[in-house]
């Protein structure tokens, strides 16, 4: 259950109540049910968008990928294995990613369903870069702002009949807690329709904050990053 600016539940008390209700309903139905409360105040991983996130997921299956995505993937796998009565240790789960077994199983799943695991993912023909306006520490990269920007680039729909661009989205080159320099690339915007860039940049206004190194805001951003993406476990 996600909580934060980019989630349906903005406050942790709301998310906790929803998670507790879902766990209780599942348990009452005789199904082993657990929930994780996860931080969505800033985007998970380094991408937002359809093909971009698939590519990032494949990096994780191949033993790489962003640490926060790996941590959440492993945590969910441990919970699901335990709920199924086949518990595993964390180091076993991480080893399955690191040694390629997870990727091998994914490739086999795709092949058995008639797909091609070697099929290339599409790339956006148009990109633009968003740069840091000043030196300092990136203290805010708001998940809602990034999500709206990705949507305006074509990654989502305003109406159910609207087409979705598989290639559209945002790549993040820095996360809250990182030191940045003026002019450094913070984001890459991806789309098939370059006229979308202006409104995507407008969506990001106010969603990116750079604070002075050594400030309380910078220290808080580093502390939040070190805390990790998993806030609570319920059930």
Tell me the role of every PLM-derived stretch.
Residues 1-235:
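Well-ordered secondary-structure scaffolds
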């Amino acid at each position: 259950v996600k909580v934060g600016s980019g989630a349906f539940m903005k406050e942790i008390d709301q998310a906790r109540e929803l998670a507790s209700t879902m766990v209780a309903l599942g348990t009452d139905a005789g199904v082993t049910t657990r929930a994780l409360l996860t931080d969505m105040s800033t985007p998970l991983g380094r991408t937002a968008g359809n093909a971009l996130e698939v590519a990032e997921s494949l990096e994780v299956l191949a033993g790489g990928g962003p640490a926060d995505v790996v941590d959440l993937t492993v945590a969910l796998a441990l919970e699901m294995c335990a709920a199924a009565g086949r518990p595993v240790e964390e180091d076993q789960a991480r080893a399955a990613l690191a040694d390629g077994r997870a990727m091998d199983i994914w490739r086999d799943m795709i092949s058995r369903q008639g797909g091609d695991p070697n099929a290339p993912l599409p790339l956006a023909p148009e990109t633009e870069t968003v740069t840091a306006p000043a030196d300092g520490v990136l203290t805010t990269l708001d998940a809602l702002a990034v999500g709206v920007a990705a949507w305006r680039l074509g990654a989502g729909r305003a109406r159910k009949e609207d087409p979705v661009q598989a290639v559209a989205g945002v790549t993040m080159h820095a996360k809250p807690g990182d030191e940045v320099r003026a002019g450094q690339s913070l984001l890459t915007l991806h789309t098939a329709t370059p006229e979308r860039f202006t409104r995507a940049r407008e969506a990001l206004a106010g969603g990116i904050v750079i604070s002075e190194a050594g400030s309380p805001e910078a220290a808080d951003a580093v502390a939040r990053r070190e805390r990790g993406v998993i806030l609570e476990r319920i059930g």
